[in-house]
Every structure is written in structure tokens, then in C-alpha cells.
Amino acid sequence: MPTFSREEIVHLGDLARIALTDEEITRLQGELNVIADSINKVQEVASDDVPPTANPVPLEAYLRPDVAETPLTQEEALAGGPKTEAGMFVAPRILGSEE
């Protein structure tokens, strides 16, 4: 039964460039050990006579009929937006500042 040491948790945090507090390290150590135990239990149950599967229910992609339709005009498309200018949607700035 593999367990994650504090040093391994710190190393994982360093690899992810995440600064972890002592409390977070302790919590993650417990959580990752529970996950590892769960994976080990599944591996114990899995046997050679059970075929591997990604999904127990076979799913088929539903494709709608490929029918040519008239696209929206620019005016129709812009009518769905709250604010437009010069034929484009106007959205609030989220990065940087105006210079």
C-alpha cells in the first residue's frame, strides 16, 4: 500500500509551483493516500478475464442531419448582445489597463 510522504507532497507542490502551508500539506497527504488506496482496491478486483472498458454503456455519437441553413445576418447576431459598436460586440476590459 503506497503512501505519500510529506516530502513527496512538498515536491508535488513545487512541481506545480504551488506554495503549500503545513495544514495544506497534511490535508493533501491524507486525501492523496485515500485516492491511492481506492486505486489499489480497484486494481485488486480487476482481473485478466474482465475486458478493459472506458464506459460500461456503449454510446454512439448523435449527429444531426447536415442541412444547409441561412446564417444570421450581422444585425441579427448583434441584436442578441447588450452593447455593440461599429458592428461588433462591446465587452468590459478584463486584462490590463487603458493607456
From Swiss-Prot:
Segments crossing the lipid bilayer: none
MF terms in GO: asparaginyl-tRNA synthase (glutamine-hydrolyzing) activity; ATP binding; glutaminyl-tRNA synthase (glutamine-hydrolyzing) activity
Nucleotide-binding keyword on record: yes
Keyword Glycosyltransferase: no
Lineage top rank: taxon: Bacteria
Keyword vocabulary terms for this entry: ATP-binding, Ligase, Nucleotide-binding, Protein biosynthesis
Subunit details: Heterotrimer of A, B and C subunits.
Function: Allows the formation of correctly charged Asn-tRNA(Asn) or Gln-tRNA(Gln) through the transamidation of misacylated Asp-tRNA(Asn) or Glu-tRNA(Gln) in organisms which lack either or both of asparaginyl-tRNA or glutaminyl-tRNA synthetases. The reaction takes place in the presence of glutamine and ATP through an activated phospho-Asp-tRNA(Asn) or phospho-Glu-tRNA(Gln).
Protein's name in the database: Aspartyl/glutamyl-tRNA(Asn/Gln) amidotransferase subunit C
Protein source organism: Bifidobacterium longum (strain NCC 2705)
